[in-house]
């Protein structure tokens, strides 16, 4: 191993940079080319600027989806008042004809 020159910056030490330039190729050899290639190509990590995706605009003939919802009255439940005695009688009358003894 070569001795480290204290007068040089760490990124200029021998062996710190590859001899060939980075490429856009994603083959195994190019993915392990250098640490930057490994992070970007091999692991898919990039710290660069992210492109913003454009939202798809609505077709010109369509309306706003909020305009289509009409105002609706509050939902009210309507129940028949039944006592516990009536429900027992209904259950007994329904259960008797179904017996297969």
Curated annotation (Swiss-Prot):
The record marks 11 as: Essential for Tat translocation through the endosomal membrane. The modification Asymmetric dimethylarginine is found at residues 52-53. The keyword Methyltransferase does not apply. GO terms for biological process: DNA-templated transcription; positive regulation of transcription elongation by RNA polymerase II; positive regulation of viral transcription; symbiont-mediated perturbation of host chromatin organization; symbiont-mediated suppression of host innate immune response; symbiont-mediated suppression of host translation initiation; symbiont-mediated suppression of host type I interferon-mediated signaling pathway. Zn(2+) 1 binds at residues 22, 33-34, 37. Zn(2+) 2 binds at residues 25, 27, 30. Belongs to the lentiviruses Tat family. This is Protein Tat. It comes from Human immunodeficiency virus type 1 group M subtype J (isolate SE9173) (HIV-1).
